[in-house]
Amino acid sequence: MTIRLEQPTDYREVENLTRESFWNVYRPGCTEHFVLHHYRTSPDFIPALDLVMEEDGRVMGHVMFSKAELLADGGRRVPSWTFGPISIHPDYKRQGYGLRLLQYALQKARQMGVGFICMEGNIEFYKHAGFGLASKLHIHYHAEPEDAVVPYFLAQELIPGWLHHNGVTEATYCPPRGYFVADQNPEAFEAYEATFPKKEKAFQEGQLPQFCQSCGMPLTRVADCGTNADGSTSFDYCQYCYKDGHFLQDCTMDQMIMHCAQFVSEVNKGLPQPITREEYIGQMKMFFPHLKRWRQEQ
């Protein structure tokens, strides 16, 4: 097993590897391969930390790193870093290769002066590489309330004392825009996806919660979903917002929020403690700007 820098001749193989690794894991289908495809030309991309793992001449693992930012007190922007996607071919998963690749990459990043990393992932895996809840370091996730303990938002000081040395006692992490390229360019993503062999999207146990990217309704089964122009299932939007490739409501984000507010009594049925209509509106005003439909308007 060897680890080396990715070369241009590896690009398509690595993108296919990434697609195979992530398909239906965190959501129906995946977009990580498209993120990688575009990221290599981003100013945030770090070529020296773009690594592949080989076994007998076959590329079976890959990880890339990116520049990022923390928004600290007074709006001060502090450079930081993140990584991902990290991919291991399904044939090699659960054999320790992912951890070996990540530990190698983190050591190389540390040697390059990378001092602090935020990322999103499963703590049960990433704790073995030194990651813990970012909230314990008073680093907040941009899409969650500041007092929330976000179980998938993780961080690590690769260089001890880096936060203190940079005057960071509390900050908010904003993921680089390059990670949202599929949402911002849905037609380009669909055209790119069509260059790969067709695979079926599906809801599976263990995926992250999925929400309608227009109204925020939870999506847990195909029957909840809308339809695309060709009649296929849209895993992005619910049946009440999207049909045959068109939105059923011609409205602004604020109008959608007020429309959804009338259903607060239904929302409260699934909550341990009920919230008021005003509280629900406040939560939606924080959440909706991060939904695909409305993020395109930001």
Which residues does each predicted region cover?
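Conserved acetyl-CoA pyrophosphate-binding loop and the N-cap/start of the following alpha-helix
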Residues: Y92, G96-Y104, V114
